[in-house]
Design a protein with these regions (language model features):
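Membrane-embedded alpha-helical bundles that constitute the cytochrome b-like, heme-associated redox core
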Residues: 1-258
Length: 258
């Protein structure tokens, strides 16, 4: 799902790597976690759309049914809100969709927990995702935004570090979107409703949890689209190689290329 890992830091080396050099960018742990997440999230999104087809309306509060006012209603086309090519299974089956969804929810939740523990133990989260005070300055954020908008990507050793927009995006997914998806999913579980209800209280009811689950899921879709676009624009072969083999060729700047 994401390309986040500890990288070789230029300041820790006697000679900083130059553009054109092959460097180790992603460990085997991150690469395995990335591709498992790709599969898990894809299955969960498609099975989630099938579950949504059973009642394509969203509400706030504890209850929601056909007579109640929905804040979002997706009109049906050919009898369903989302067509079969976007769902798992492709033909309507709420029971099967829930089985797929729950099975891969465990894969996602356990994988996230293990990755976060590993990232803390290895120091990756603090070292590579921590946003320094200087990076919070509006001028710094605006500069990085303009660089991205102009498709000016870092070269040489600078390509080994995450900029503030990348850090914000990755932290938003790791610490906001994914935990929110998992917790709101638990809140909607009938087994949880029969036991402790503190999650229901936190999210304001089962229907509010369902709405937040839907919003967070499509926030994740938005991240994927931007992530894939950046991979393509930055050089898909080099980026894919780094997430398959771990090795990344540092981009050259214009002067080096000349």
């Amino acid at each position: 799902m994401m390309a986040t890992d500890e990288v070789i830091r230029p300041e820790t080396q006697p000679f900083a790597p130059q553009g054109g050099e092959l460097v180790k960018r992603h460990s085997i742990v991150t690469r395995i976690w990335h591709w498992i997440n790709v599969l898990a999230v894809l299955v969960m999104l498609m099975s989630g759309l099938m579950i949504f087809n059973a009642h394509p309306r969203l509400y706030w509060g504890e209850f929601g049914a056909n007579p109640d006012k929905a804040w979002l209603e997706i009109p049906e086309t050919n009898g369903v809100a989302f067509p079969g090519w976007t769902t798992i299974p492709s033909t309507y089956s709420l029971a099967d969709a829930r089985l797929w969804h729950l099975a891969f929810a465990w894969v996602l939740a356990v994988g996230l927990l293990l990755y976060l523990v590993w990232g803390l133990v290895r120091g990756h989260i603090i070292r590579d995702l921590h946003i320094r005070s200087a990076e919070w300055k509006p001028s710094h954020i605006w500069h990085d935004f303009k660089q991205h908008a102009a498709l000016r990507f870092p070269t040489g050793a600078a390509a080994l570090s995450y900029n503030v927009l990348q850090k914000l995006a990755y932290c938003g997914v790791l610490f906001v979107l994914l935990p929110l998806i998992i917790l709101t999913g638990l809140t909607m579980s009938p087994s949880l409703n029969a036991g402790p209800t503190w999650l229901l209280d936190i999210f304001g009811g089962r229907q509010s949890a369902r709405s937040l689950h839907f919003i967070a899921a499509f926030g994740l879709v938005g991240f994927f689209l931007v992530h894939i676009a950046m991979v393509i624009l930055a050089g898909p072969i080099n980026e894919m190689r780094s997430m398959i083999t771990g090795w990344y060729r540092l981009p050259r700047d214009k002067e080096e290329a000349a």
